[in-house]
Amino acid sequence: MAVELTANAVQAVAAGQNVLFTDAPVKCSRGYVVHRAGAGLVTLRGACNGCASVARYKVMFVGNISVPTGGTAGAISVAISIGGEAVPQTTATATPAAVGDAWNVATAAFVDVHRGYCANIAVRNISTQAIDVANANLMVERVA
């Protein structure tokens, strides 16, 4: 089971806000991964088979980030968040030398969801300023 969510157009993402995903080229037919078009939150369900006590998902994000016009060139970052909190180990940082210079970043994490529970994930701008995000691609794969 795999899901792919995308947003190709450039979007302005304020500091502390989530990247929005507008399209779902690959959808989950079992209801394990739930997403509303245009939203930034993705819900992972802890539906388990047999004796398993957790459902494990591999979450991967790839996209282009840049400092928008009016911003200050310097380090900008995104990270995968779980339950509204950024996971520090998933921080993807780029340091554009000029406003508008786009950098490709990627990050991934395993997310365990206990049987009967759900987890909300997102890709969050953890920079201190707004960023532009283009060609955003979030892939979620159930691996166990």
Predicted features by range, described:
Residues 1-144:
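Extracellular jelly-roll beta-sandwich "head" domains, especially the C-terminal globular C1q domain
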